[in-house]
Amino acid sequence: RANPLPRVANLAGGFTDPGSREIGGVISTAVGQLSFLDHPQIAAFLSRSTFDFGQLRTEPMTVYLMIPPNELNTYYRFARLIVQACFNALSVEPKPGDRRVLLLLDEQAQLKYMETVVSAIALLRGYKVRIWSVFQDLNQLESIYKERWESFLSNAGVVQVFTTNDEKTARYFSAKAGNFTGTSLSETTSTSAGS
């Protein structure tokens, strides 16, 4: 009987050919991307759990994932895995009475590019989830998310800006804020001794 999907069979055959360099490249990439799982503490952490990120909706709690700065380059993939697991758990319709959830992604640039973060910022709002992304400046945000960097700002419920030390960030938010002339009234009362 003839194969109904010859194109698929040919593509798959390229991976099963022992002389194929493609399968070696795929395996090499997978091993590199999963190397953080070799760390004994991470393996132990991931081996079992009594926690479900869905509990963020039903119980008042705060969850912290902290990786020392000197370990971020090695374990950012682990942080990405945890953030993705959280997104997956919260991407279901909330039940009546479920709490709102705030996910604070401080130093989000350390996670590198995550397509799911771009989608989650817009989509999870409908599931009672707010994502608060913290970047150092617009250059950092744009270098990671390229042409999609403004999605973070346009989908944000609130944008906070502190100490703009680079010109691009200062100009961007100055233009967004527009012109405003304010007035203030003050009243002082003074008394002098001996009156």
Model-derived segments and their meaning:
Residues 1-130, 144, 154, 165:
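P-loop NTPase motor domains
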Residues 54, 119-122, 140-195:
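P-loop NTPase motor core of the ASCE superfamily
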Residues 135:
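H-loop/switch region of ABC-family ATPase nucleotide-binding domains
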